[in-house]
Amino acid sequence: MSFPRAAANHPFRVLAVLLAAAVGVLLPGPRAAAAAGGPSLAEGTSVGIHNTYGDTAQFPFLADALDTGASLIELDTWVDPFTHEWKVSHANPLGNKNNCVDAAGPADLYRGGTNKDLGSCLDDLRIWLGAHPGHAPVMVKLELKAGFDATVGLGPAQLDALVRTHLGGAVFRPADLLGGYPSLDAAARAGNWPSRAALAGKVILEAIPGTFEQSNPFDHLWTDTEYAQYLNGLQAAGAIGQAQIFPSVLGAAAGDPRTRYPDASLRQWFVVFDGDAHAYVDGGVDTSWYDTNHYLLVMTDAQNVTPALSDTAPALADATARVARLAAAHASFVSCDWTGLPAVLGEQLQRGQ
């Protein structure tokens, strides 16, 4: 199904709330406001492509992947301490291997040399969205393969600066969800997400710990924790608006997986969760908890849920049914490698149904 476009913003909403408070009139909360413009970001399910940058046979250019209608792209990035760049590749920490180009306008998205850095990939996304203003919001999943390295000027603040430079106002930031609430958790549970229609053409970024980082016995400060600590610092400094990224809790687990963070003050920043679809669905995890609290849930490897489907080329009917099943299982975003099925990649479903 497709979602209707958002209704125009109402400049008198704040005044109305103040007047209502004065006279004791109960007004609709944020969820009702989102409903007026269609399902909120947390009330829908979209589909995206695992390692979107890497399949250059199917997608010679990143724009080709976006042309499928996908609403999630994944970019693996490495910090390069020698060039001070954010490299994009699956396995080379010192080189770029991807389908991103140096584009200055829409016509450049499908030509020129590839294998560019993260800034160029974000430029490609921004330019493509500018040419497709009605496109559903896109989740950019950043896997920081080896984590941050603030000691060489490649920490959370520098990544935020890069995002601001290359995506500008296209980003839906943590501060945009936060509003007047004391924490992201409180804002999410109150349903303060805008409608998906209102977020058309926007980007939401999540950051997860990388595979190399997780296997590094000398790395004791993973991406999720480091970025959450950074958010704590920004909030204390009254500068939370600088943050561009939502840190994500990685890995399916029963209950509230944020209890893994010993510093309880960090847990408030995690309203995005990311894990294996098979572990969530076949593992008996109560995923309704995420939906009830309006948290975003990214389910990866959709093909591995029982019964397993082809990794890359399932039948259209099977893939469509699988996405519907994961939407019913409360996924916000479904990640897969079904690059040849644009009818599936472009789906926008109601979450939890």
Model-identified regions with their sequence ranges:
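Bacterial N-terminal signal peptides
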Residues: 15-26
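C-terminal region of N-terminal signal peptides and the immediate post-cleavage residues
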Residues: 24-36
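Initiator methionine at the very start of the polypeptide chain
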Residues: 1-2, 34
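Alpha-helical protein-protein interaction elements
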Residues: 4, 18-19, 159, 222
